[in-house]
């Protein structure tokens, strides 16, 4: 048995190593992230450091910080802002696709048990939503527009995730697992850890007519992405009942519930990658300029001056005539932190013959996703309606699309006991 255990362990290690060392030709894949397209801007001609924005001139179609924003009398190279609305829906649906896999009944492997398996999960996506059309690269032939104003004609309908899952039985009904996941057509990887505790298992007489019951905690975190941090935490409760067919085949249906918490954060994103903040503004300094708001506005500075971070000497503007304070240092940003929850139902069936195991599982949202920590309204999109004098410009609260996701998983593996 020790030799058998070492063999799948070595195979699993070699498999993970080969996946991590796969050669890449440097080209972006369709599902790679393109967060610099999730931006918006206001093309009001730049006066007084942009304080007097016309609310009707907010543009929510990417392409900020470029000469293209000067079309129709607008301000060229308009300042960039992070689009947290589309970001929220991207984090939500990507988090479900990378959620920890289960594909196992409530009964654990036992103290000497060991499992290694390959899992393929398919999750539906809201392909027509701008979160996917702008937030992922797409193929060259599927793009409409250019640069950061580009969008896919349609996003992917499903996310396909391959997963290598290894589990080891522990004393007292515990089981420890680890998994490595890869989102197909992308360079997105995730690693995870899960711990399961079977509170009631193994009885075959008397109370053995009752199903086995187990709870599990799991976590998956995305790796290798500098601009995005994504962690998915799962809490599961599972019921299952094993049946023996012909003395050799074990058939185990299982049913359970899952609570998912998706934690999405971003690093600093450059929304105008074709420009250089250092070349345009090698040295920044605070300057005081006249506050252009009318004297009757309660928000006007009492001194009549406002401090702005502007460029010192030595910078080179992106285009002749461009205001010096409209430089590329304004075109980087961080998306708001997203804390999202899902309540899911899981149903599946496992078939085991000797050491060979095949499992099928279907998980689905029982209700629409929601925030367990609501983002600040200040992070929402600005309203295109005029603001009331003396009050901040109104913003639209960030919401999640009323879209329920499902995941179908097929797993094949070897179980040693």
Predicted regions and their residues:
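Outer-membrane beta-barrel "beta-signal"
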Residues: 195, 403-417
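Outer-membrane beta-barrel translocator domains and adjoining extracellular loop/strand segments
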Residues: 129-133, 188-193, 224-231, 264-274, ...
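Transmembrane beta-barrel domains of Gram-negative outer membranes and organellar outer membranes
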Residues: 27-203
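Transmembrane beta-strands of outer-membrane beta-barrel proteins
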Residues: 114-118, 174-176, 193, 208-217, ...
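Residues that define the transmembrane beta-barrel architecture of outer-membrane proteins
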Residues: 110-112, 157-162, 187-191, 209, ...
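Outer-membrane beta-barrel translocator/channel fold
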Residues: 211-309, 314-324, 403, 407
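Short loop/turn motifs that connect adjacent beta-strands in outer-membrane beta-barrel proteins
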Residues: 104-112, 173, 200-213, 244-251, ...
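Transmembrane beta-strands of outer-membrane beta-barrel pores
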Residues: 120-124, 180-186, 197-199, 217-223, ...
